[in-house]
Every structure is written in structure tokens, then in C-alpha cells.
């Protein structure tokens, strides 16, 4: 379970970094060269999703819970935005959903 969660966390970071670098280029006028590491990060994100031993749709569904929590961590650390009570309440709910799906994929 820990290995799966850590893999999901690294996967989420790759997705967020790739999207963030693209966002910097579009919204903040960053150099077009930022698209190269963005593309590499997004390619790594896709590859990491293939490392799970479950059907792709199930992996994507479970990954969503960890993505939500990672995005909230990014919001706080990188964007410098304080988390709200709704963020703090929603994150554990998302993780519970991920946990239910991951535990279940070993039993089907």
C-alpha cells in the first residue's frame, strides 16, 4: 500500500510540474523553452501510471485521491495559499476513496 501511494505521489508531482510549467508559459509569459521540461515531466507522468498492476481505469480512479492531496500541498507550498477547512475536510475523503479502490483491486 505504501509503495502504491508513493508511486501515486511521484506521479502526481510529475503531472502537476508539467502542467505548471505550461501554465507559466501561457499565463506568465515564461520562455517557450519551459515547454521542454514540461513535456518530459508529462511523459514521465504517463509512464508512471503504467507501472500499476491494475486495469487503467481503476488506476486512474485511485490516483485521483492522491492527486487531490498533492495538488493541495502544491497550493500551500508553491502558490503560498492557505488551505481552507474545506480543503482539510476534502483531502481525507479523497484518500479514503483511493484506499477503498486500491484495497479492492487486489481482490477482483
UniProtKB/Swiss-Prot annotation:
Ranges facing Cytoplasmic side: 27-30, 82-84
Keyword set includes Translocase: no
Record's GO cellular component terms: plasma membrane
Family matches, as InterPro entries: UPF0060
Pfam families from the UniProt entry: UPF0060 (PF02694)
Membrane topology, from the record: Multi-pass membrane protein
Species, as recorded: Salmonella dublin (strain CT_02021853)
Top-rank taxon, per record: Bacteria
Family: Belongs to the UPF0060 family.
Protein name: UPF0060 membrane protein YnfA
Transmembrane segments: 6-26, 31-51, 61-81, 85-105
UniProt main location, coarse: membrane
Keyword terms: Cell inner membrane, Cell membrane, Membrane, Transmembrane, Transmembrane helix
Topology feature Periplasmic, residues: 1-5, 52-60, 106-108
Protein localization: Cell inner membrane
PANTHER family (alphabetical): UPF0060 MEMBRANE PROTEIN YNFA (PTHR36116:SF1)
Keyword check for Coiled coil: no
Amino acid at each position: 500500500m505504501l509503495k502504491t501511494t508513493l508511486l501515486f505521489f511521484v506521479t502526481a508531482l510529475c503531472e502537476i510540474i508539467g502542467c505548471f510549467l505550461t501554465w507559466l508559459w501561457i499565463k506568465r509569459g515564461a520562455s517557450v523553452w519551459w515547454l521542454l521540461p514540461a513535456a518530459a515531466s508529462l511523459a514521465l507522468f504517463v509512464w508512471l501510471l503504467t507501472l500499476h498492476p491494475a486495469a487503467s481505469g481503476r488506476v486512474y480512479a485511485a490516483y485521483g485521491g492522491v492527486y487531490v492531496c498533492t495538488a493541495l500541498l502544491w497550493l500551500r507550498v508553491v502558490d503560498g495559499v492557505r488551505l481552507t477547512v474545506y480543503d482539510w475536510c476534502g483531502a481525507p475523503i479523497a484518500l479514503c476513496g483511493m484506499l477503498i479502490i486500491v484495497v479492492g483491486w487486489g481482490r477482483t
